[in-house]
Amino acid sequence: MLIETPTPVRARYFEAKHLYRDIMYQAFEDGALWLEAPKPRLHDDMYTFEDIENKATLLDHEICFDAPNIVRVGRDLLYQVSNSGNMKGFKWLKRLLEPMGYRLHYSELYSFAHFDSTIVPLRPGLVLMNSSRVTPDNCPEMFAKWDKIWFDDCVVQGSKLADEGYMPPCSPYIGMNLLSVDENTVVLDSAQEPLMRELDKYGINSVPVQFRHSMTLSGGIHCATLDLRRKGTLESYCD
């Protein structure tokens, strides 16, 4: 199943329509169900323009969310309410997916944006947690029985500019934004040696790649990839 997300980011409004159409049609030809969430109008009243520390600035007038506001683990989906996904978006997904046998959960761990440098499932029963945002007290209940790797020691590297200036990465934790290839293999930023050593303790093999410019301008490896073709059956991992 493919769901086109109703992004709250005006600059990305036509992204799915124009950049990814060929990919979506290929998935459709391969048998995927293709759905589109209601397109938001993104009027000014969708946003709070004043400075409100640690609170989401995206309001709840229309359905809005980005794909990385969701962590999917088999039948269970965890939705992060933040600046890139609101509660109305969660309600829409819940009404759509729960009749199909999925279970929807929501969290409000931090307000900034996406979720894929915060909670990173590595394999059934093992999850990487950003310990600067997630603690044993606020850890989502669906991961209660899972083993957890608590980590926030990312190597922060920005990009040098032509005038010898410096542009920091989009997040100090973007190094945790990795792609899980299988239950024992991840692709991650080659600078993240502390994270590689930690993953090795759990039998996770790391494939390091250079990805600095993307991490400065847009996002990490998980941000820049989307695994549409998957093998296996729909299972429950959080019972």
List the model feature ranges, each with a label:
Residues 1-239:
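The feature marks the mature, well-folded catalytic cores of soluble enzymes
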